[in-house]
Regions:
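A generic structural signal for short, non-catalytic loop/turn and secondary-structure boundary residues
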Residues: 11-13, 113, 155, 186
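N-terminal secretory signal peptides that target proteins for export/translocation
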Residues: 1-3
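Acidic/histidine-rich catalytic neighborhood of metal-dependent amide-processing enzymes
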Residues: 126-127, 133-207
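Bacterial N-terminal signal peptides
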Residues: 7-17
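Positively charged, low-complexity intrinsically disordered regions
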Residues: 5-6, 22
């Protein structure tokens, strides 16, 4: 559930970023409605990969961030398949935290869908659409986390970076591969919150 993911990511961000003081309590009901509005909006944007066309998601997210006064830039090797990088500054005591979600989805066989895959239909307590759990839920949660940090003027001991990544579904050369090669200083962080991840354990020790 996206709103639950938002709460988890916001709490994780607050914990890792080390708040200088507790933020004021937000209006969670209004936030739930706003989260759903952005969630459905990005689900209705066709970024199925191939061909990708993640630019529609990057532009939507940038528009939301711009209205909140959060600095964001769209960068990429392909104008139709860019990434977005946004940053909220902390006091610099610690290295940044990176929050990521990818904006592309896999393709669809529409004949197998109860509701159209780009409809973001709410039915029976569920939201139906391509990308609902991979990965536009995390993308929306990351976006809302940035909005909350900004609106509540949360004091942070580290910068929080948000990335909307293109090309995760099998074509990472335009996404994280490009970002690491061309924009690493802007995404360099101590920790990353994303859909994936893992550790290597050797002799019972995590390496």
């Amino acid at each position: 559930m996206t709103f639950r993911r938002l709460a988890i990511i916001f709490a994780s961000t607050a914990s890792v970023a080390v708040l200088a003081q507790a933020p004021q309590e937000p209006d969670w009901k209004k936030l739930e409605d706003e989260t759903m509005r952005h969630y459905q909006a990005v689900l209705r944007l066709d970024s199925r990969n191939p061909p990708g066309n993640e630019v529609v998601v990057a532009e939507y997210v940038k528009g939301v961030l711009d209205k909140e006064g959060i600095p964001a830039q769209i960068v990429g090797s392909d104008p139709k398949r860019p990434n977005l990088i946004a940053r909220i500054k902390g006091n610099g005591k610690k290295r940044p935290l990176l929050v990521m979600g990818h904006s592309d989805t896999v393709t669809t066989d529409e004949a197998k869908w109860t509701h159209p895959p780009l409809s973001a239909t709410r039915d029976g307590g569920y939201v139906y659409g391509r990308g609902t759990i991979d990965d536009k839920d995390n993308l929306t949660a990351g976006l809302m986390t940035m909005l909350l940090l900004k609106r509540l003027n949360v004091p942070l001991d580290r910068d929080v970076i948000f990335v909307s990544e293109s090309g995760e579904e099998g074509s990472s050369g335009v996404g994280i591969g490009y970002l690491v090669k061309e924009h690493f200083p802007e995404i360099d962080a101590e920790y990353c919150l994303a859909e994936g991840g893992g550790v290597t354990r050797i002799g019972g020790q995590v390496k």
